[in-house]
Amino acid sequence: MNFIETQCPAKINLFLRVLNKRIDGYHNIETSFQLVDLYDSMSFERTTDEIIIESNKDFLKGQDNTIFTSASKIKEHLSDQEYGVKICIQKNIPTGSGLGGGSSNAASTIIALNKLWNLNLSEKKLISIAKEIGADVPFFMFGKNALGTGIGDELEETSSIKKNLLYFFSICYCFVRKFK
């Protein structure tokens, strides 16, 4: 396999209860994650050596983002470091909106590169890598509506709400990393 295309869904939190602060800096939470019909599109093409990112958003073209970080962490598991990847992303999920776009992109990158590079890493290992990237990444690896506890990484499948939702996006950016 030399090429994979995928869609990365957004999510909303139907509720969020922030509990105690942990030693690792995260907070324990209780939340309800709901996948929504808003997507970023990504493609992955096997190349040699480098990780290259092309995007409609300039800030994603460098190395300081969840896509590059995820690809680098997966690449550490290659016995043949000659593999690389060209990742193209069409960003549609508003950045900093709390909809999980970066986490969704990270999860898609982990899943796609495990397939593209034939790594056959276990689900447990993939989730472990996901947790290193961010608290919401395991939810997007899970890929279903869920009740989240712990830092949001302990997941129990829940049913979908059957209502139409109207989304409102703020022009404010939420610096999620700041609140770790």
What are the language-model segments listed below?
Residues 97-126, 139:
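DPxDG-like acidic metal-binding loop motif
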Residues 11, 105, 136:
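Acidic active-site catalytic centers that drive phospho-/nucleotidyl reactions
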Residues 30, 85-97:
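Short pre-catalytic strand/loop immediately N-terminal to key active-site residues, enriched for Gly-Thr
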Residues 2-83:
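N-terminal beta-alpha supersecondary unit
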Residues 58-65, 69, 94, 100, ...:
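Residues at secondary-structure transition points
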Residues 2-7, 15-31, 119-180:
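ATP-dependent small-molecule kinase catalytic core of the GHMP/sugar-kinase superfamily
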Residues 76-86, 112-129, 133:
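Phosphate-handling active-site elements
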